[in-house]
Amino acid sequence: MSKQILKDMETKADKTLHALKEELKTVRAGRANPSILDNIMVEYYGTSTPLKQVATISAPEARLLTIQPWDKSIMKEIEKQIQASNLGITPSNDGTIIRLPFPQLTEDRRKELTKVVKEYGEKSKVTIRSIRRDFVDDAKKMEKNAEISEDELHVLLDDIQSLTDKLTKEIDNIVTDKETELMEI
C-alpha cells in the first residue's frame, strides 16, 4: 500500500519536473533556438500560416538562425512579421535565405533571466510541497481509518519526506544548470 502511495506521489511530481523543464526552455540563453519562432504567423495565399509550415528553420551556428522559405515570394512577408514580433532580432535577407543573428546577452539581462529561472524553480518547489502535504494527509487518514498501523504511518511519512527532499534537490540541480547556461559567455 505504501509503495503505491509513493509511486503515485512520484508520478505527480514528475509532471511538475517536466513542466519546469518546459518553462526553462522558453528562457533564451544567448543561443539561437528555432522554437523562438513558433508563434510567428505569415500571410500565405490569404491565410495566416505558421512560419515553420512555409519554410525550413535551422540553427547552423550557436547564435544564428536561418530561414529558407519554400516559396521565395513570401520572403518580405517573413521579414516583416519577424520585425513586428518584437523579438529584438533584425533579419537580413540575401534573396534566398533570411538570417537572424542573435546578439550576445548583456550582463544585466543575464542576471534578470537568472532571477526568472529561480522563480520558476521556486514555483516548482511550492508545487512539490503541496503534493507532499496532500499525500501526508492521505497517509494520516489511512492510519485514522485503521488501514495502516501507527508504525507504518511513521515509515510512510519518512519515505514521503525523503522523496520530497530528493525532488527538491533535483529542482535545485535543474535550476543551477540553467543558471550556469545563462551565465556562460
UniProtKB/Swiss-Prot annotation:
Q: Name one GO cellular component term.
A: cytoplasm
Q: Give the Gene3D superfamilies listed for this entry.
A: 3.30.1360.40, Ribosome-recycling factor (1.10.132.20)
In terms of superkingdom, the source organism counts as Bacteria
> Which GO molecular function annotation, any one, does this entry have?
ribosomal large subunit binding
GO BP, one annotated term: translational termination
Predominant location of this chain?
cytoplasm
HAMAP family in alphabetical order: RRF (MF_00040)
Write out the similarity annotation. Answer: Belongs to the RRF family.
Q: What is this protein called?
A: Ribosome-recycling factor
